[in-house]
A protein has these predicted regions:
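Aromatic-lined substrate-binding rim segments of carbohydrate-active enzymes
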Residues: 2-76, 142-144
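Active-site region of glycoside hydrolase catalytic domains
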Residues: 47, 51-59, 64-144
Length: 144
């Protein structure tokens, strides 16, 4: 794994924090098939960040960025009937809740208040509110 080397270089460059995307489609490539092993081991990464003395701003999406395939939304979501991506849509939010249960279940143990490196969590990213029918409801649902 290159993580230790990369984190050491970041620390040597006098940084004290990093922000990290946690792509949903990387950890659930097929519906219900979760993978947090090997290079996808979030807990191991957070342990290394802590050992390097770096704080972490966690960015689990559900959408992380336009540079990542589908913004990290799993491809298996797209054909779901009645599902509206990145909306206050019960079906979409049900899938997001499963993702959040997995990823936030890991991140909560690494909160700064518990001695871990995670100083914050950003929900969603690059949200274009022009396309969001219920902005307040969507962000509120992610938060809750």
């Amino acid at each position: 794994m290159l993580w230790s080397d990369r984190l050491a270089k970041v620390k040597a460059a006098k940084y004290n924090a990093i922000d990290v995307y946690f792509p949903w489609n990387y950890h659930e490539p097929r519906e219900g098939c979760w993978d947090f092993s090997g290079e996808k081991d979030v807990a191991a990464f957070l342990d290394l960040a802590s050992e390097a003395g770096l704080r972490v701003l966690a960015r689990p999406g559900p959408y992380i960025c336009s540079e990542w395939d589908g913004g990290a939304l799993p491809a298996w979501l797209y054909p779901k009937s009645g599902l509206e991506l990145r909306q206050n849509n019960e079906l979409f939010l049900g899938y997001v809740e499963k993702w959040y249960q997995k990823i936030l279940g890991i991140l909560k143990d690494y909160q700064f208040s518990k001695g871990g490196p995670v100083i914050g969590v950003q929900l969603d990213n690059e949200l274009d509110f022009f396309d969001c029918h219920d902005r307040v409801g969507y962000i509120g649902a992610l938060r809750d």
